[in-house]
Amino acid sequence: MTYDKDWALRWLNDFGERVQENKQLLSDLDQAIGDGDHGINMARGLSELKKAFTEKEPADLTDVFKTAGMTMVSKVGGASGPLYGTAFLNMSKAVDSETIDAEGLTKVIEAGLEGIEKRGKSHAGEKTMIDVWEPVVNALHQEDLTDDVVEAALQKTKDLKATKGRASYLGERSIGHLDPGAYSSALLFHAMLQTEVS
């Protein structure tokens, strides 16, 4: 498998479409345990990203992720902008050639996870997007990432008590709700798995 600039563009455009389709659901999930604007914020940021890609085609794979990072930081409100932004910027730094193989992709996604952990001062088990990213990275290392793995990771956030972010104010009452950031991250990785390599 070889992943290149065109693949990454298709992946992130598909992610944008999935977020647009699930905008209301993401905001509803966020309404239960957060500010209620995750869907709107993410949809706006990804729509701006699509525009950025159209106006100036990225030079290479690194540039795709760098553009994504800068756009998410500047156009997405709330905590998710800086977190996704940092993830993509870290991913751009982990790309070391025009194309990457499966091992390279694992390294790139892992760099994204590390960026989120550092920026959010968080780790797995705190009911955040990390609870999807970490199982995805682990599965990539084992070469067995599937849509089921992504979905299982997302569903597990329902039983976790939030100890980070706005949701942590709810304490025990955050249990029983899916984490919105984990949900949008699941959309990101479903899109990645469904984006065919050219």
UniProtKB/Swiss-Prot annotation:
The keyword GTP-binding does not apply. Unlike the carbohydrate-specific transporters of the PTS, the complex DhaKML has no transport activity. ADP-binding subunit of the dihydroxyacetone kinase, which is responsible for the phosphoenolpyruvate (PEP)-dependent phosphorylation of dihydroxyacetone. DhaL-ADP is converted to DhaL-ATP via a phosphoryl group transfer from DhaM and transmits it to dihydroxyacetone binds to DhaK. This is PEP-dependent dihydroxyacetone kinase 1, ADP-binding subunit DhaL. The keyword Amino-acid biosynthesis does not apply. Residues 6-194 form the DhaL domain. The gene is dhaL-1. It is found in: Cytoplasm. Its cofactor is Mg(2+). It catalyses: dihydroxyacetone + phosphoenolpyruvate = dihydroxyacetone phosphate + pyruvate. Gene3D superfamilies: 1.25.40.340. It comes from Listeria innocua serovar 6a (strain ATCC BAA-680 / CLIP 11262). Mg(2+) binds at D30, D35, D37. InterPro entries: DhaK_L_YcgS, DhaL_dom, DhaL_dom_sf, Dihydroxyacetone_Kinase. The lineage of its organism: Bacteria, Bacillati, Bacillota, Bacilli, Bacillales. ADP binds at H38, G39, I40, N41, A79, S80, G120, M129, R166, D179, P180, G181. Its EC number is 2.7.1.121. GO terms for molecular function: ATP binding; glycerone kinase activity; magnesium ion binding; phosphoenolpyruvate-glycerone phosphotransferase activity. GO terms for cellular component: cytosol. Homodimer. The dihydroxyacetone kinase complex is composed of a homodimer of DhaM, a homodimer of DhaK and the subunit DhaL. Pathway: Polyol metabolism; glycerol degradation. One of its GO terms (biological process) is glycerol catabolic process. It comes from the Bacteria. Its main location: cytoplasm. Keywords: ATP-binding, Cytoplasm, Glycerol metabolism, Kinase, Magnesium, Metal-binding, Nucleotide-binding, Transferase. It is an enzyme of class 2 (transferase).
